[in-house]
């Protein structure tokens, strides 16, 4: 969904560029807090007050970080900084305290290559999972129709007047 804000309002909001990771600061449920998405749009976007923008840098790829936010290690860290009862929140200041494990921290070039490989593998798993999730119900529906067709064919005996004796 696209929506636009006035240029004046956009100046006051945080900018989101292609490859940035946007995290929710606030949610009514624990799973929604710090949920991440990688912005893939070509045009600059903006976000409001209940989101934090992670800008990838020379040490961490955006998609690597987004995948990391789905891990138990991240959730354990997030738990320590989540505040609230009805509405849960992790402030941008607290998010900055979360540590991101990166491979080969002493060799940034190698680290980024490994991160890219990890992202590639996880993207493939995600595509396969999505394919199965979307394709399986359709396949089940087709098999059900096939079953019904053959069942009806096998159980459609000739009517008594058609039977030659």
Give the label of every model feature segment.
Residues 1-165:
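Charged, alpha-helix-forming regions
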């Amino acid at each position: 969904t696209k929506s636009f804000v006035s240029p004046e309002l956009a100046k006051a909001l945080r900018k989101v560029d292609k490859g940035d990771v946007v995290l929710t600061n606030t949610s009514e449920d624990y799973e929604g807090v710090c949920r991440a998405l990688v912005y893939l749009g070509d045009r600059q976007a903006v976000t409001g007050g209940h989101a934090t923008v992670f800008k990838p840098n020379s040490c961490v790829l955006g998609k690597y970080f987004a995948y990391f936010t789905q891990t138990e290690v991240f959730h354990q860290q997030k738990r320590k900084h989540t505040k609230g009862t009805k509405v849960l929140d992790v402030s941008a200041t607290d998010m900055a305290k979360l540590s991101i494990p990166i491979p080969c921290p002493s060799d940034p070039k190698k680290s980024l290559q490994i991160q890219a490989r990890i992202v590639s593998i996880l993207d493939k798993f995600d595509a396969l999972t999505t394919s199965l999730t979307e394709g399986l119900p359709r396949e089940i529906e087709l098999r059900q129709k096939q079953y019904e067709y053959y069942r009806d064919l096998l159980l459609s005996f000739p009517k008594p007047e058609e039977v030659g004796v």
